[in-house]
Amino acid sequence: LNKVPVSRMSSSTVGSLLSARGHFTVFAPDNDAVQAYLDTLAMKNIIASASWDGFSDSTTLDSIRKVIVYNSVINSGDNLPAYDVAQFPINDGGEFSKSNMYDRKLIVNYFDDPDSITINGALMDARNNNIRVLNGYVHCVHSVVAPTNNTLGYLLNKIYTEKESGYYVSSMLVHAVGMLDTLQRYRDDEYEQAYQTGQVPEMIAHESGVGYTTGKLPEHRYYGFTFFAETDDVWEREIGKNRFDITVDDVVSWLKENGYYPTAKTDENYHSEDNILNQFVTYHFLPMRLASDRLVLHWNEKGYSSQRKQPTVVQYEYYTCMGKRRLVKFLESAESDGVCINRFPKIDNSRRGSYHEISCDADKAGIKVPIPETEGEFNVRNGIVYPIDQIMAYTEDVQHNLHKERIRFDIASAMPEMMNNDIRLQYYSLGQRWGFPFTSQYPYFDDVFIGDESWFFYYNGYNETMKNYQGDELNVRGFLDITFRLPPVPADGIYEIRFNVQSEGHNRGMVQFYWGENKDNLPPMGIPLDIRTSGLERRTTSGTFPSNVGWERDTQDDDYNAEVDKKLRNNGFMKGAEIYCDGGQGLSTMARADPVIVRRIIVREPMKADETYYLRFKSVLDDQTREFYMDYLEYCPKEVYDNPETPEDIW
């Protein structure tokens, strides 16, 4: 500890850092663990002998010391707590929300026989853990925590070229479609340079007052990937050949024979997004690194407690896969027995229902997501591999089922950079906001285009009591001009796009929405929306006035409540969703019962599954003190919102 500097720019040591104020978690390897690590280095001929005297040069010695020390320490800073065992991620394969000093996420696994915990495969001592010190916790481990620096691309290429069993066929297919170079990426070095040299300027303060800081710019722009990979056992079962005898042609023939991707091309241009194999393989990848506790986010849905951390009502996420853009649905509930891919259960979603699963047909049960592969060489720096035991595909049945449901997504979930750079799902600290550069300064987001003088902030209300779906929100100060590339719709048809807004603030603004296919020439959608208007009031800096949009509190008469909902829809409004609390966890009042939380219907147009659509928000008030608020969007097909037999649910 006392021989490893805190950073390249500092002469202070990690030992000095751990003697100071703060909140630190240390996974300290015992002497036998360090010796075993030196033995491994000697076997790999990295050092001459398995001792500290076996290093031939100081550079290698310093590097190994840094690996051992940096990977052992999580610095939670001044505002967030250190981790005792009770605060470890509860999911098997879950990650600590804070990275270690090597900027790597550590993964926890739990075992029953005997009861034990590992940190990146390092067994934690059964007695010498949870050692409380003034500024944190120490947990003794029986091996050095040392994640590999390899990438997912390197791993899959190695499996393919060296014919390693387990994921040989899947890695062969990834190689065939030309994804390996993309999967090598882990950091945007151009952004590193821009950040370190001040090319990306500091943000303004989001609000004035004690404790409010400037928008914190991300230090890095990391890439990440999640791969749901069929095991070799699956392919042997489906193809009927030994895993090492299976060829790309075998898989393509099998896809055609089984009716997968019937509109795709069947030529040998596997790098093309129009190709059948390309569409099959890329659907297995998400452009973000998601540990098991981040596939479906839980925070303020009905009945959920972060103390018990047990799923309650049906909760879901919709992500866009890599390659040809298509939706992948992830669902977790009290009844689902973990996270499932493309699960479509029957839900108790009546007005007086529970929003729990009633049942699920076998052909709609989806794919159970198991514990990820995190041991040894699989613990790569830019990705996670989940082994799946059945074929994963974007079938016509999946598209049909997606087209029969309302698709709600937190706007931040459509921005992979939020997850890849530890911005989303972090604990709230007073006054802290993340800020992002204008696109002209640096394009931090692939799917968000930030105009000059649009000060774009992310407010992480996770573990707070804000009235936001999943706790967080995005907002903009200054002269608003933001364009989003939207996720795809699952099938051709007429859709509504709804925009959820919490209209409690007096400083909200008026916004013109634009929507269409040509990002640089989007037509306006209707008249500007005054997002200061709630269900009951219109709040302005000059006073509060009735909104007269038809909002009324629910009564015991559901027929009357349905009429109120129709009246609101006629005015372009909907009540908030019943699924989440009107604030933090454990509240008996849901968002639907709060008149300041409303959904605005901003688009009702035909949309095609193979088109890319954009949504632009532009302020119509010449007042840079106004604030634009964003929480979540909904796609709702006409078959749902205009269904006379089964009206859209309130959830």
Task: Describe every region a protein language model picked out.
Residues 1-651:
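Mature, structured domains of secreted/extracytosolic soluble proteins
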